[in-house]
Every structure is written in C-alpha cells, then in structure tokens.
Amino acid sequence: MNRYLDALGVGVPDAALFEHQGKPNMLTRFEERASPLDLRDRDAVQRVRQDFVPHAAIGNWDALGLDLDNVLIRPDGTPTYVDVGGSGPFRAMGGPKGDAWGSGTSDLDTMQFKPPHTQDVFGNMSEQELGQSFDRYGGEDAFMDALQHLQDASTRNIMQQRVEDIARRVA
C-alpha cells in the first residue's frame, strides 16, 4: 500500500519488498531528521488529519501506531507514514483481517475512534473535512489511477469498490 499512497502524494518513505525465511517483508528508507508526531503541535496534527481519507480507503487501522510511531513529521512539516503494514487485507502484525476487510468503507467512521490515539487526531471529522481530505489527493480519479500500483487483483477490486463508496459518500 506504500506505492498506492505514494501515487496519491501521501508522504511515505521509499520501500522495497523482499522475502525473508519464506515470508514477505518490507524495507523502508530511514526518514532522516523526521520526528514523532507531538499531539501538542496543533499544526502537525491538522496536517496528519488532512491525510485521513487515503488511510481509511486502504483500511490502515494502524496509521498512527500504538505509540504514535507510525507517523513522523519531516523537517519541512509534512507527515510521513513509515509503517502501513496494517492496511488492506492485513492487520498490523501481518494476520488477515478476514471479513473486516471488504468493499464497504465503515473505516471512514470507525477509524476515527480506534484507541489509543486516533480520536485525538482523526476524531469527529465532519463530512466536509472528509470531502476535503479526499479532494486534497485528487478525488476519485486519482484514487482510481493509483490502483495500478496494487499487485493483487482481489485487493485492487476491493479497493476500487471502496473508492467508489467513498466518492458517493463525500460527493
């Protein structure tokens, strides 16, 4: 999902997939001089909040990380998401989401309130804010174009349905 977010323009480090002991792994480039998100920095929190819809689209339940360690703030103030392993059909530790991953986008609502930190950053987003987050990254056309970066056909199909659902909701 790194490539999908990158195609949208969401900050993610360069990444490469490789196999280790028969299991897929991802190696990401170190984000030099990036610092952890500080919830007291309202400007940084607002910039992360603007990235919500792309993360909800991919089902990145762990966008912020348990200790706010999955999002860093680069020296120029832009967020970078250094671990999107909890997105798509997989949970943060690699297990399948099963029926919790599908074409519907209840994540637009439920991801605003997943403990421990999402309510502090994403909580109570208005429909207008959701629409602005979607439009910030090019809206339906850009979200659909980015699907070409997803290798698995089933994931691509589900993502297409999720994008269509989001577009209907925030139109």
Language model regions located:
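Conserved ATP-binding subdomain of kinase catalytic cores across diverse folds
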Residues: 1-35, 57-61
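C-terminal catalytic region of ATP-dependent kinase domains
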Residues: 74, 78-171
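Short, structured coil/loop segments at alpha-helix boundaries
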Residues: 37-45, 152-159
